[in-house]
């Protein structure tokens, strides 16, 4: 039912008054002289007040019902902008828009002033953000725990086509959504030594005498669920020194030395993923991971003891989910807290630890399963290294007692890697210390059992399970694409907004309605025009909104194969030049994504993309049939502009390497067609959407694995069989796209030919053929838009609400 006009008018008036109140008394500005940023802060604070009311109610209910709590530990939370997200979930978006209109303030203009919170990088952090929102929507009592990075990863700029990392200053104007909890402080220790002592009962105990201690200070951000149903807490930790100023040294004239401890402590929460190519960088990463894990575990144990007489029922009252290997030191830290601080016997402490912890694996790349040098661990966390040795000893002894003496198997399941220097295997630690280990797509979970955790799976065959990732439709449909949302609501009714997971399938019959397909195409064109304007503003390239928008936006990594896309781009460019008379499909190739600061090969791929763009976009013989764009500084807000405008979604990772992917789901939900390999969640998308409604190509995971076993990474055979591929590689290698430095890409191409680890060349011809199928379908608009509608209609299963319901039912036991 629609709201009564009088009630609606009152709500608008109340919100307008609340904004004016915040502008005057919280921001300290008169409406006549307020800047746009002052208005943003006032609006955010007014919205936050509404969130706090729901927050307090939800928190009180959770305590009153002794509801089981979920603690989600993640090094990243890519939450993006929160103004529209919060207003939309509270049902206040239209109210706020009308209220501000009466003040001659444009909410859309104000929205753009909010910086993206620099708390993550890619899919891992965005998944965590979607999960937090879904947990609130489903009424699960949850806390997210992470780090309040002052500068995040980095702001990506392009200097002569090269990625340049610049400081991200997202907190310059403060953060109106957060509450500093100055009273919530925990000591976090590093270094020092461990002493064996006898306690009052004559029992030997270990005492850690740390060499350094910093403080973890809590900052809370409310996370509101759909319709304001419930509000959970994202608690982020900021590192502070124990002593802000060494006054004696300062007065002695050592002004820099007086604040050296402050700089060292605060560096922990300064940036996300500091480069780990140096020993100092590795040390800082380990400090970060332990810092937030220790603070979070101390905090949740304190909360538990406020409600329960002891910790012996911890697994019944709390579920701790480790998002990837970054928080896996939690296994050793929880054992330390239980054994050393709460004096729980080792065997019981281990039972509680395993019963409480669960681990999500996000990668099959061995190099991405973190390992730390034993020497570094012994120096930084000596007590934890003792605990890890002891866990490993019990583990190996138990296996031997069961008759397992195979040296290779014992070496594979050990927590200590002995090859190439002794290192602690954090993936194995997380596996052993958790009662559940899940993958994030059906294929990924299957491959976990046969690759990275093959031997551990044989020992614990019930531990690995699958929870295919999902996305929140509130962010990636309602907020990112309001035009499409309005269309869907008109077609399916307003109930869709509360149950998209169940009701989207009712859209299937509309795919055969010409009028609906026409509407669908029109709303896409609207989004493409908006993106074309952004492209013009940011990189100065004019694109045709009626061209096919072919999009690959994600972290730059060799296994994601942006290089394969670029090889196709060059091949297409050459084909258009050689045969301009063909009825080519006008196409805009759109790339975006960041490369890790120390990842040279990925940064070279970005440079290649920009070099190709420069040549193609300035070649008059192409007649605008092909444009290439690399949009810098990809983040959530840019994704919200790109995804609704995409016609073709590139999901072309080497099969068996992408754990799941979630951009595939976001594009599919908005009606983009997918060109991709049978990798990650593409497999399940294929099952839901239908293989006929996607462009699947390339080697399967099984074929890739067979090549790996055979060591078959040479590209010579593929190149010899494909004149098109040979011409492309020759053009890049010879400097056609790098006339200022003709040898710039010689190493890249020679490396590809000699050892094509990610099988770019092997899949090239199949990829070219799939792209030709794309062009054929685009030439038949009524069929293209029929398939586009079907993609949207069949994406309901990929809701993060479904994913979280599965976690809560199968792993956390947290749904009533």
Locations of regions flagged by a protein language model:
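A conserved ligand/cofactor-binding region detector
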Residues: 1-816
């Amino acid at each position: 039912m629609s709201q009564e006009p009088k009630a609606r008018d009152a709500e608008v008036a109340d919100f307008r008054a609340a904004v004016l109140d915040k502008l005057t008394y919280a921001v300290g500005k008169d409406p006549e002289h307020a800047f746009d940023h002052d208005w943003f802060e006032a609006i955010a604070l007014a919205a936050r007040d509404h969130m706090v009311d729901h927050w307090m109610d939800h928190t009180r209910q959770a305590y009153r019902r002794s509801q089981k709590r979920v603690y989600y530990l993640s090094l990243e939370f890519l939450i993006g902008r929160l103004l529209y997200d919060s207003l939309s979930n509270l049902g206040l978006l239209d109210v706020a828009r009308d209220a501000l209109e009466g003040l001659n303030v444009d909410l859309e203009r104000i929205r753009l002033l909010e910086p993206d919170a620099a708390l993550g990088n890619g899919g891992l952090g965005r998944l965590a953000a979607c999960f937090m929102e879904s947990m609130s929507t489903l009424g699960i009592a949850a806390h997210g725990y992470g780090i309040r990075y002052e500068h995040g990863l980095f702001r990506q700029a392009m200097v002569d086509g090269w990625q340049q990392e610049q400081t991200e200053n997202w907190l310059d104007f403060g953060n109106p959504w957060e509450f500093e909890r100055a009273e919530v402080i925990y000591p976090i220790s590093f270094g020092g030594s461990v002493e064996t002592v006898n306690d009052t009962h004559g029992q030997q105990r270990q005492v850690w005498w740390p060499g350094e201690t910093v403080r973890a200070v809590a900052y809370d951000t409310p996370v509101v669920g759909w319709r304001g149903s419930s509000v959970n807490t994202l608690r982020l930790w900021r590192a502070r020194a124990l002593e802000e100023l060494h006054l004696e040294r300062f007065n002695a004239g050592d002004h820099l030395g007086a604040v050296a401890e402050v700089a060292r402590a605060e560096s922990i929460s300064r940036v996300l993923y500091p480069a780990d190519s140096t020993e100092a960088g590795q040390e800082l990463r380990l400090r970060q991971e332990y810092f937030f894990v220790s603070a979070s575990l101390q905090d949740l144990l304190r909360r538990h003891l406020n409600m329960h007489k002891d910790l012996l029922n911890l697994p019944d009252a709390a579920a701790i989910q480790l998002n990837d290997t970054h928080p896996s030191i939690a296994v050793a830290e929880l054992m330390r807290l239980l054994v050393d601080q709460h004096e729980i016997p080792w065997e019981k402490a281990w039972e509680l630890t395993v019963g409480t912890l669960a681990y999500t694996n996000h990668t099959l790349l061995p190099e991405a399963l973190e390992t730390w040098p034993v020497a570094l661990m012994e120096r930084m966390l000596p007590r934890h290294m003792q605990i890890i040795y002891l866990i490993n000893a019990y583990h190996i002894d138990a296996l031997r007692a069961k008759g397992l003496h195979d040296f290779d198997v014992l070496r594979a399941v050990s927590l200590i890697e002995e090859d190439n220097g002794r290192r602690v295997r954090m993936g194995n630690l997380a596996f052993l210390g958790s009662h559940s280990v899940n993958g994030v797509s059906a294929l990924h979970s299957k491959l976990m059992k046969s690759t990275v955790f093959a031997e551990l799976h044989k020992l614990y065959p019930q531990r690995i399970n699958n929870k295919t990732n999902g996305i929140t439709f509130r962010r990636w449909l309602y907020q990112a694409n309001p035009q499409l949302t309005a269309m869907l609501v008109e077609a399916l009714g307003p109930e869709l907004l509360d149950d998209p997971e169940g009701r989207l399938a009712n859209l299937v019959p509309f795919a055969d309605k010409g009028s609906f397909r026409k509407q669908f195409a029109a709303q896409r064109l609207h989004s493409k025009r908006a993106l074309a304007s952004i492209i013009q503003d940011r990189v100065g390239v004019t694109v045709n909104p009626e061209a096919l928008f072919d999009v690959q936006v994600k972290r730059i990594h060799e296994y994601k194969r942006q290089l394969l896309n670029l090889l196709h781009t060059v091949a297409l460019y050459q084909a258009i030049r050689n045969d301009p008379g063909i009825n080519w499909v006008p196409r805009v190739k759109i790339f975006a994504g960041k490369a890790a600061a120390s990842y040279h090969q990925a940064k070279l791929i970005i440079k290649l993309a920009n070099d190709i763009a420069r040549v193609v976009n300035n070649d008059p013989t192409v007649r605008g049939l092909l444009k290439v764009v690399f949009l810098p500084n990809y983040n959530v807000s840019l994704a919200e502009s790109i995804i609704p405008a995409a016609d073709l979604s590139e999901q072309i990772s080497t099969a068996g390497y992408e754990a799941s992917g979630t951009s595939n789901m976001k594009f599919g939900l908005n009606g983009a067609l997918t060109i991709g390999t049978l990798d990650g969640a593409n497999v399940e998308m294929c099952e839901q959407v239908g293989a006929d409604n996607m462009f699947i190509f390339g080697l399967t995971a099984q074929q890739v694995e067979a090549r790996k076993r055979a060591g078959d990474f040479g590209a010579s055979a593929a190149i010899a069989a494909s004149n098109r591929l040979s011409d492309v590689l020759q053009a890049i290698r010879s400097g056609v796209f790098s006339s200022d430095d003709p040898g710039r890409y010689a190493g890249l191409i020679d490396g590809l030919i000699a050892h094509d680890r990610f099988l770019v060349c092997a899949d090239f011809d199949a990829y070219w053929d799939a792209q030709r199928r794309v062009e054929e379908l685009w030439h038949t608009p009524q069929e293209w838009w029929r398939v586009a509608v079907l993609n949207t209609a069949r994406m309901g299963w990929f809701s993060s609400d479904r994913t979280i319901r599965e976690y809560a039912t199968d792993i956390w036991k947290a749904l009533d």
